[in-house]
Amino acid sequence: WYKNGEKEKEGNLKDGKEDGLWVVWHENGQKAVEANYKDGKEDGLEVNWYKNGQKESEGNWKDGKVHGVLTAWYENGQKQAQANFKDGNRDGLQVMWYVDGEKRLETNISEGKPHGDSVTWFANGKIRSEEYYRFGIIRAAKYWDNKGEPADSLEEAEGGFNLDQTINRKGLIYLKDSDSPYTGKLFEFHANSLKKKETKE
């Protein structure tokens, strides 16, 4: 329980490990997480909510790893990202949107690497890049600036934007802009949602 009397979390333990449905609440009483566990590992559907009650993310887990479609939303309810995972690794179509709903990125991933067509857009809706990859190696590309004029290189398109998506130790997925990580995170997933919410409050 929180100091203000609100319930913090609730769930079952089996042999000292989380088992079955666990629920975590924000300190303001809003539900924060619903996650299913098996032998202490997430297994099944996990849903996260913002403090305002808006859904933050939803995805399936298998034996402690995200598996299947993972979807994230902005706090205003607009869809932020949708990605396909296989045994904890990105695999398949990955899509991102700006907060106003304009599409930002659409790319395909195979075995953790870009494979096939990859397209990005500026916030004004104009296309920013069209690239074709084969297992992480870029084979063809076209770039434009935010006015729709052709750009000779990705760096010319307002300071550069590459599709190096990385997952750091904390499980945060970032798009990198030049040499520094992009300031807005795509979405996050955690090996233990209960610990995540405990540290956030």
Where are the regions that the model predicts?
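Glycine/tyrosine- and acidic-biased, solvent-exposed loop/turn segments at the edges of beta-strands
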Residues: 1-201
